[in-house]
Swiss-Prot record:
This is TBC1 domain family member 10A. GO terms for biological process: positive regulation of proteolysis; retrograde transport, endosome to Golgi. GO terms for cellular component: cytosol; extracellular exosome; microvillus; plasma membrane. Residues 505-508 are annotated as: Binding to the PDZ domain of EBP50.
Amino acid sequence: MAKSNGENGPRAPAAGESLSGTRESLAQGPDAATTDELSSLGSDSEANGFAERRIDKFGFIVGSQGAEGALEEVPLEVLRQRESKWLDMLNNWDKWMAKKHKKIRLRCQKGIPPSLRGRAWQYLSGGKVKLQQNPGKFDELDMSPGDPKWLDVIERDLHRQFPFHEMFVSRGGHGQQDLFRVLKAYTLYRPEEGYCQAQAPIAAVLLMHMPAEQAFWCLVQICEKYLPGYYSEKLEAIQLDGEILFSLLQKVSPVAHKHLSRQKIDPLLYMTEWFMCAFSRTLPWSSVLRVWDMFFCEGVKIIFRVGLVLLKHALGSPEKVKACQGQYETIERLRSLSPKIMQEAFLVQEVVELPVTERQIEREHLIQLRRWQETRGELQCRSPPRLHGAKAILDAEPGPRPALQPSPSIRLPLDAPLPGSKAKPKPPKQAQKEQRKQMKGRGQLEKPPAPNQAMVVAAAGDACPPQHVPPKDSAPKDSAPQDLAPQVSAHHRSQESLTSQESEDTYL
């Protein structure tokens, strides 16, 4: 497949047609003409009146295609309560993920508070852990020159990403600069994969909620954990998921499945942009954010559910099917979905209640993969296994998070005084008897041999499990006794605690 050149117009590939135009066609939406017109304002758009335009709560220009009308506002008291609960979860993240993951899932379904959404996405996706594991990596990639063949394509795509949003309205503005940095860094981080233009809207949404470095690592997690293979050259993963979606549709909405089968409409004609852009180009913005909240928590299952809900309500009744007699009418219906079925409260409720599980998706994936191998041979792009949400990512890659303790623990020798005590602790009675017998047998007074076990004591009084020490018989009898020097645990060496770690996390 030819690499993207950023020049083809917006269209979906026909059934059986090559996917060579898919990677570039996603860069241009249906409003490409107005996009270019708006971007022609350049970086002086503020001087030409942009500063006087009203901006909605999401950062879109009021009256533009990205802006929304009246929204269901969450009462301020409820919002503050949710913020308090989320702050507690984020400050004790490992504990909540280990013991109360279901509660996190329920709170993601209710919606993450806007002030904490960016931080929560970093924790849910594992991007926070990746950043800690790779300090300075993004700066290193950012300072590198990059591959010219990708830089030209990325630069041409910058003004097409949410041109009615205040971050990206100005050509060469800070939003477009950060978007360029993130996408260029990814081409250097994964040179074998390069750049797919569907990654641009994903990165842009992340940049609306967090700085460039954090957005980069969240993008890495999406491409490698949530949607592996989606942005590879052959787009094999998205083709497989198209077949999975179509198979699941038969159980969710037989009427819609039968109609699409009769019209011989390939799933790639309607689901490619949905899945590759995670509905960021399809749904109203309030719905996009709610879908992403659940997506980061529960994984690609949410993307499948949203697609199935849209298909079910667009083509799921005989009356709706009668209005779509041909392929063109059907495709137009799916491209111009009713605002009612995309409305935030309605869509989220339908998605939560739809009984489609990870097990069903994985079972269907094996079936479709077997069919692919029988008809087309082996996959050319080997992508890592897909992980279904935050819990699976945490279990697969826990990361070096600090232990949930009030203070670091230290190791003390047995004969050292305990914290807060003045006297040196006496050895056990059994050890005293053995020492007396040895001294009587030798006829001389000797210093008692140093103990061979260390006692681990927490600085705050919390006991930690003792380290393994070789048995007493393993040491040579004629060796001179030596005092054990105090040793510091690995946790103490890291000089990390929950408080110090979270104090660095001030970006909301």
